[in-house]
């Protein structure tokens, strides 16, 4: 298909999965802006073999220098302190390591002086400075 045919089809079928790379959701574009990584480098519909991509978008995708990794957590058991992480990122290494687990310190420490006295204290300090200088 030519670029004109792709745009004509996708203009009338914006919800088609093959057109999602041309017309992504606003949330996808926002994630791309926040991560400073263009959405077309990692967005799944852009990687589909049947995706409708104009020549300019194909050229931009070819410049993406991204290693797309899928990392999933397997058996997470706190009682045995065992964490099984499966990394599918062009490597065959699967490591299972024992990790020492301890509870977080959840002790609440209150400030020495209540915060509501801060503006009054600053006002008193300003008056003292003005009175003596």
Swiss-Prot record:
Pfam families reported for this sequence: Pox_G9-A16
Quaternary structure annotation from Swiss-Prot or TrEMBL: Part of a stable entry-fusion complex (EFC) which is at least composed of proteins OPG143, OPG147, OPG155, OPG086, OPG094, OPG107, OPG104, and OPG099. Formation of the viral membrane is necessary for the assembly of the complex.
Keyword set includes Transmembrane: yes
Transmembrane segments: 112-132
Listed name of the protein: Protein OPG104
Localization terms from the record: Virion membrane
InterPro entries listed in its UniProt record: Pox_virus_G9/A16
Functional note: Envelope protein part of the entry-fusion complex responsible for the virus membrane fusion with host cell membrane during virus entry. Also plays a role in cell-cell fusion (syncytium formation).
Recorded GO CC terms: membrane; viral envelope; virion membrane
Family of the protein in this entry: Belongs to the orthopoxvirus OPG104 family.
Gene: OPG104
Biological classification of the source: Viruses, Varidnaviria, Bamfordvirae, Nucleocytoviricota, Pokkesviricetes
Keywords tagged on the record: Fusion of virus membrane with host membrane, Membrane, Signal-anchor, Transmembrane, Transmembrane helix, Viral envelope protein, Viral penetration into host cytoplasm, Virion, Virus entry into host cell
A biological process from GO: membrane fusion involved in viral entry into host cell
Species the sequence originates in: Monkeypox virus
């Amino acid at each position: 298909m030519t670029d004109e045919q792709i745009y004509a089809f996708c203009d009338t079928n914006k919800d088609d999965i093959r057109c999602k790379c041309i017309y992504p959701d606003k949330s996808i574009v926002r994630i791309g802006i926040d991560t400073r990584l263009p959405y077309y480098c990692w967005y799944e519909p852009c990687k589909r073999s049947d995706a409708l991509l104009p020549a300019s978008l194909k050229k931009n995708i070819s410049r993406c220098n991204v290693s797309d990794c899928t990392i999933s957590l397997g058996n997470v058991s706190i009682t045995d302190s065992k964490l099984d992480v499966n990394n599918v990122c062009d490597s065959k290494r699967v490591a299972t390591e024992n990790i020492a687990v301890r509870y977080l310190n959840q002790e609440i420490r209150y400030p020495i002086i209540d915060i509501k006295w801060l503006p009054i204290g600053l006002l008193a300090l300003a008056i003292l400075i003005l009175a003596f200088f």
